[in-house]
């Protein structure tokens, strides 16, 4: 998750409880329902709790400005090379599986060939005489 997305989530986490707290306080302080202190207390607590995401959002903002959350070009290249090497190893493993499957399939389908035919199939192209 990028620092900008985290900062946005923290800011939304700050605004939602604060707005809910204000609504609860206004609803609790209504003339008809002034006796309902539970809503008032819940509203005040909700406003106080909204301070934690505000602090987190401020921290992320300052970290983004001073470069704490950004990765260095060396780290980015190193991570990219590691990913390429991992992909290469995975591809080599898959190729080995395919070769093994082909060898199994070919050796299983050509048992009727004699030793001379097998030698002919195994000879390199440059060693065969051509007129």
Curated annotation (Swiss-Prot):
Biological role stated in the UniProt entry: Accumulates harmlessly in the cytoplasmic membrane until it reaches a critical concentration that triggers the formation of micron-scale pores (holes) causing host cell membrane disruption and endolysin escape into the periplasmic space. Determines the precise timing of host cell lysis. Participates with the endolysin protein in the sequential events which lead to the programmed host cell lysis releasing the mature viral particles from the host cell.
GO CC, alphabetical: host cell plasma membrane; membrane
Domain notes: The first transmembrane region undergoes a helix to beta-hairpin conformational change, which is responsible for its self-association and pore formation in the host membrane. The coiled coil region is required for host cell lysis and for cytotoxic activity. The C-terminus determines the size of the hole.
Protein source organism: Mycobacterium phage L5
GO MF term (any one): pore-forming activity
Localization annotation: Host cell inner membrane
Protein name: Holin
Keywords: Coiled coil, Cytolysis, Host cell inner membrane, Host cell lysis by virus, Host cell membrane, Host membrane, Membrane, Transmembrane, Transmembrane helix, Viral release from host cell
Superkingdom of this protein's organism: Viruses
GO biological process, alphabetically ordered: killing of cells of another organism
Pfam families, sorted: Phage_holin_7_1
Biological classification of the source: Viruses, Duplodnaviria, Heunggongvirae, Uroviricota, Caudoviricetes
Subunit structure, as described in the record: Homomultimer. Self-associates to form a pore.
Membrane topology reported for the UniProt record: Multi-pass membrane protein
Coiled coil: 74-104
Stated family: Belongs to the Mycobacterium phage D29 holin family.
Main localization category: host cell
Segments passing through the bilayer: 9-29, 40-60
């Amino acid at each position: 998750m990028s620092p900008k997305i985290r900062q946005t989530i923290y800011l939304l986490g700050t605004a939602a409880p604060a707005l809910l707290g204000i609504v609860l306080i206004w609803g609790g302080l209504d003339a008809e329902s002034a006796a309902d202190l539970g809503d008032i207390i819940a509203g005040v607590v909700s406003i106080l709790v909204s301070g934690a995401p505000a602090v987190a959002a401020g921290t992320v903002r300052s970290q983004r400005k001073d470069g704490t959350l950004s990765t260095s070009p060396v780290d980015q290249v190193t991570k990219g090379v590691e990913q390429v090497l991992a992909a290469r190893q995975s591809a080599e493993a898959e190729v080995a599986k395919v070769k093994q499957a082909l060898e199994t399939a070919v050796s299983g389908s050509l048992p009727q060939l004699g030793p001379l035919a097998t030698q002919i199939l195994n000879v390199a192209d440059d060693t065969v005489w051509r007129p």
